[in-house]
């Protein structure tokens, strides 16, 4: 593949460019936040097409935040579109009411391009994966602690790599190359994440680490905010997605979102190879990536282990065979995909 799949990301790290969210904060729009939702969305979509300008008005990020909070009145952040009035404390499908952070730390186990990564894990998830290795986070949306947006912003600013001498910037446990929003899944906490970024001033890339089951509306709000999508492409068909993650209409939603997200930002696509699912899932996913996503990095992952409720599903109630993983990598290499190593 021509060019580096993460060239813009590296320009930010090298101080040659600005993180997208900072540019969105500087993009001024003339808006009355008391307008109805349709008018606000219309303004939002038109603002995406215009160059940033500096006149009196309101930050484009503030408009995004207002729309995100309005979505909590009848929650449609993810494609379950449960309609819960989360703004009034009603629980939706994910069970998340207020943002709770399960943990936050400098992660050294992500893809080489990302480490050290300041990873913020939210409790709760939009999926119900029977093999979830983070089930203690994803299935307990009331666990973890609440933090103010300002507090999280200050924590991010404390991790910015540019604060440290150049000889300390590689694999140093005290700073990060990026902010990595994850869970569970971060989608349920999108309004809070936008609040955090409103309070933050660090020129640091933002990574959206997600199952990509969010709505088009949520994805629009991330446009101009996220620098790298770190996606989790789990299944190659709707049957497996419904059976193992209770995710209806999976292929249409996740394929659509990958296409849209790739237009917005750079991308690393993760695929965890599942036992017994190379032909039904791994092969079609890798084929689809090769045909539909240009200049992305792909991580074919072998980390599967039977966890959570996997014992109730015969084909995945065992570790992944090395021959299965090798076959998936062979397929990816045969397609010319840019693999992470």
Positions of predicted regions on the chain:
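A local structural micro-motif
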Residues: 140, 207, 338-341
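Pocket-edge positions in alpha/beta enzyme catalytic cores
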Residues: 144, 246, 317-320
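Auxiliary Fe-S-binding modules of radical SAM enzymes
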Residues: 1-88, 262-267, 271-341
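Conserved AdoMet/S-adenosylmethionine-binding subsite of the radical SAM
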Residues: 151-314
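N-terminal [4Fe-4S]-dependent radical SAM core
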Residues: 42-122, 130, 134-141, 167
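Generic domain-boundary/flexible-linker signal
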Residues: 86-89, 131, 140-143, 190, ...
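Extended interfacial segments that mediate partner engagement and assembly in macromolecular machines
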Residues: 102-127, 133-166, 174-177, 182-187, ...
